[in-house]
Amino acid sequence: MASPQELACVYAALILQDDEVAITGDKIATLLKAANIEFEPFWPGLFAKALEGVDVKNLITSVSSGASAGPAQAAAAAPAGGAPAAAAPAESKEGRRSQGESDDDMGFGLLD
């Protein structure tokens, strides 16, 4: 889990990107000081160095569009597979049930 200092640096970098300002350690530190956030002095420089040469706006838009395109691509590919693709999940469900039932018979209990 990210620390509050890390999250503050991320938000500061996003604010700078939204305002189309170059992301530097000094500017991140200035934003954090203006927000009265206590932070270790290495965090702003670390985030600025990590984001150096990275188009943050493009990164954000490509991540969000990739997540929404995934289900659409899967739905488009499903009709091409036809009935054999539909039969495979039914077999795997039956296999899971029999495997789950066999695990129940083993007698392993938490408090035995």
UniProtKB/Swiss-Prot annotation:
Disordered: annotated span: 71-112
Claim: Ion transport is one of the keywords in the record: no
Oligomeric and partner information: P1 and P2 exist as dimers at the large ribosomal subunit.
Function: Plays an important role in the elongation step of protein synthesis.
Family under the similarity heading: Belongs to the eukaryotic ribosomal protein P1/P2 family.
Protein's name in the database: Large ribosomal subunit protein P1
A GO cellular-component term linked to this record: cytosolic large ribosomal subunit
GO biological process: cytoplasmic translation; translational elongation
Record field: compositional bias (Basic and acidic residues): 91-100
UniProt KW keywords: Ribonucleoprotein, Ribosomal protein
InterPro entries: P1/P2_N_sf (IPR038716), Ribosomal_P1/P2 (IPR027534)
GO molecular function, one term: structural constituent of ribosome
Positions with biased composition (Low complexity): 71-90
Pfam family, one: Ribosomal_60s
Keyword Cytoplasm among UniProt keywords: no
UniProt-listed Gene3D superfamilies: 1.10.10.1410
